[in-house]
């Protein structure tokens, strides 16, 4: 091969790298793939015992999770290919569909009840958890609302209050299922986006205080939530009843020490820790991979949040406000839910029933989170394709 051919090959490779960099945020993509891969490994490890005992197939949950990951990647690819203008124009319809699902699941005989909670709609092959769909649809709606009414949010109390009333209505429907954790995440997404849009601090503080007081009152006046709160404050007071799950989780995390007991060698997953492959996957990871594994996972979610806000800021500077708010919302949603899940596993927060995004077993969470990642990558693509950043076009919100 001549020197000219070698140089031409190098130039073609560099051009390919530039095109990939323009279309994909490689750092974000790699972190998501790392979480998906590690999640598959940990689901296989955490579920092998219970799958073998209850279903006769030690790889049952791994096979299903692998299928969910494939479907999730397909959902991400589809979301990535659809222009943001379509989602922005459909914001009102998406809001209506979210409310339709939240009401439909509460209709007697329609919603599927598991462990006393009616959160799912049966789709045949798997059950769809409507709260996961609602998180994505409300994030899209809020991004559209703030793009159209950003000035009203900053200057008028009514502009600030309108989306919060809609979110509060959705949160009440979630509490009727009940799904306290999803209601908290949904309200947090709304509050974070309103803050980033430039809502007045006194309005923001008033609403945060009101929401916190309402959630506290709800927790105190509901017996099973009060039991969870009591178990969270002192799980060792009743380690074989209300505090059982948390004490087993703490034992798992403590057993991991610095480097863990080894992949597949967890003891707590062997019928001691309930939901080991689902809500408490992080505890099994901590036991098997130790503090090193915990640090890697925390850094991956931290990087996801960093890149989400980086993509959002770039979009805002380029005048792509819908994409900016969408990126901020997805970043808050995924990272907040991840850190709540880890906090619950470590006994820092009461049990919420939230999955570890992109890692825990479950089809609904995987599909919706992957779709959100696809939208995030679409924001990056459209920002790059819009040309050089135009900083001067941004006015208002705190994200600028």
Curated annotation (Swiss-Prot):
It is a multi-pass membrane protein. GO terms for molecular function: lipid-linked peptidoglycan transporter activity; peptidoglycan glycosyltransferase activity. Its EC number is 2.4.99.28. Keywords: Cell cycle, Cell division, Cell inner membrane, Cell membrane, Cell shape, Cell wall biogenesis/degradation, Glycosyltransferase, Membrane, Peptidoglycan synthesis, Transferase, Transmembrane, Transmembrane helix. Its main location: membrane. GO terms for cellular component: cell division site; plasma membrane. It comes from the Bacteria. Signal peptide: none annotated. The chain crosses the membrane at residues 30-50, 65-84, 92-112, 123-143, 157-177, 179-199, 201-221, 247-267, 280-300, 321-341, 356-376. It is found in: Cell inner membrane. It is an enzyme of class 2 (transferase). InterPro entries: Cell_cycle_FtsW-rel_CS (IPR018365), FtsW (IPR013437), FtsW/RodA (IPR001182). It catalyses: [GlcNAc-(1->4)-Mur2Ac(oyl-L-Ala-gamma-D-Glu-L-Lys-D-Ala-D-Ala)](n)-di-trans,octa-cis-undecaprenyl diphosphate + beta-D-GlcNAc-(1->4)-Mur2Ac(oyl-L-Ala-gamma-D-Glu-L-Lys-D-Ala-D-Ala)-di-trans,octa-cis-undecaprenyl diphosphate = [GlcNAc-(1->4)-Mur2Ac(oyl-L-Ala-gamma-D-Glu-L-Lys-D-Ala-D-Ala)](n+1)-di-trans,octa-cis-undecaprenyl diphosphate + di-trans,octa-cis-undecaprenyl diphosphate + H(+). Pathway: Cell wall biogenesis; peptidoglycan biosynthesis. GO terms for biological process: cell wall organization; FtsZ-dependent cytokinesis; peptidoglycan biosynthetic process; regulation of cell shape. Peptidoglycan polymerase that is essential for cell division. Belongs to the SEDS family. FtsW subfamily. This is Probable peptidoglycan glycosyltransferase FtsW. It comes from Thioalkalivibrio sulfidiphilus (strain HL-EbGR7).
């Amino acid at each position: 091969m001549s020197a000219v051919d070698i140089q031409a090959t190098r130039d073609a490779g560099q051009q390919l790298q530039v095109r990939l960099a323009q279309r994909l945020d490689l750092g974000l993509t790699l972190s998501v793939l790392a979480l998906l891969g590690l999640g598959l490994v940990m689901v296989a490890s955490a579920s092998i015992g219970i799958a073998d005992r209850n279903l006769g197939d030690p790889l049952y949950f791994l096979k299903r999770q692998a299928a969910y990951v494939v479907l999730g990647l397909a959902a991400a690819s589809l979301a990535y290919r659809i222009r943001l203008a379509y989602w922005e124009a459909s914001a009102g319809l998406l809001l209506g569909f979210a409310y339709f699902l939240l009401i439909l699941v509460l209709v007697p005989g329609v919603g599927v009840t598991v462990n006393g909670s009616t959160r799912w709609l049966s789709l045949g092959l798997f059950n769809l958890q409507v709260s996961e769909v609602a998180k994505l649809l409300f994030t899209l709606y809020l991004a559209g609302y703030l793009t159209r009414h950003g000035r009203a949010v900053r200057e008028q109390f009514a502009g600030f209050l309108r989306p919060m009333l809609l979110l509060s209505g959705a949160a009440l429907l979630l509490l009727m299922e009940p799904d306290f954790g999803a209601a908290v995440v949904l309200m947090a997404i709304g509050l974070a986006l309103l803050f980033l849009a430039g809502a007045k601090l006194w309005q923001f503080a008033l609403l945060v205080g009101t929401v916190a007081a309402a959630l506290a009152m709800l927790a105190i006046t509901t017996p099973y939530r009060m039991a969870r709160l009591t178990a969270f404050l002192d799980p060792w007071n009743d380690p074989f009843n209300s505090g059982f799950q948390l004490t087993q989780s703490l034992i798992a995390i403590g057993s991991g020490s610095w480097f863990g007991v080894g992949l597949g060698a967890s003891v707590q997953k062997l019928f001691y820790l309930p939901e080991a492959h689902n809500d408490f996957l992080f505890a099994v990871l901590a036991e098997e991979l130790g503090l090193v594994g915990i640090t890697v996972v925390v850094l991956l979610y931290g990087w996801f949040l960093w890149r989400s806000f980086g993509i959002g800021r770039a979009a805002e500077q380029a005048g792509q406000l819908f994409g900016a708010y969408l990126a901020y919302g997805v970043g808050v949603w995924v990272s907040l839910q991840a850190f709540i899940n880890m906090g619950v596993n470590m006994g820092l927060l009461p049990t919420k029933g939230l999955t570890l995004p992109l890692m825990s077993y479950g089809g609904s969470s995987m599909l919706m989170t992957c779709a959100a990642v696809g939208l995030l990558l679409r924001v990056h693509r459209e920002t790059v394709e819009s040309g050089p950043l135009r900083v001067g076009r941004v006015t208002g919100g705190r994200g600028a």
